A protein has these predicted regions:
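OB-fold single-stranded nucleic acid-binding module
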Residues: 6-8, 13-14, 24-130
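Predominantly extracellular/luminal regions of secreted and cell-surface proteins
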Residues: 17-18
Length: 130
């Protein structure tokens, strides 16, 4: 069993996403393609603000990362990271075909069985010293 404190490679997740579904992992890599998202609404009607997506890239592969932002608090906030920054990410993995939710440009979506969405949902982002 891998503890959340020991970084793993992104390739390990890509190769066997089902074994990581809803597990917390620690990854290290470089931030790519930070994209702030428009506010979105949860099914309960609550609006969420400050969400963004990015890719985390390590020497083995890359993974889509979602930062959900704050719900119920109308704020305008820039992402906490920038393109090219090295970070350590603690995240919960959402793997495809489990009917789980994932964050997209259209807000929160339910992953259908045929969608190959593997997403890391950020729990904690720590900048690494260069």
């Amino acid at each position: 069993m891998v503890s959340a404190a020991e970084p793993i490679t992104i390739r390990e997740i890509i190769d066997d996403p089902k074994s990581f579904h809803l597990k917390q992992v620690t990854l290290r890599g470089t931030v790519r393609n930070v994209t702030p998202l428009d506010p979105y609404k949860l099914q309960a009607g609550t609006m969420c603000y400050g969400a963004y997506l990015f890719y985390l890239e390590d020497e083995t592969s890359s993974i889509n990362v979602a930062v959900y932002g704050r719900c119920g608090v109308p704020i305008v906030k820039d992402p906490d990271i920038e393109d090219g920054q090295r970070i350590e990410l603690t995240a919960t993995i959402q793997s495809p075909s489990h009917g789980g939710y994932y964050l997209s440009f259209q807000g929160v979506k339910v992953a259908r069985e045929r969608e190959g969405v593997i997403q890391a949902v950020a729990d904690r982002i720590t900048p690494l010293a260069e």
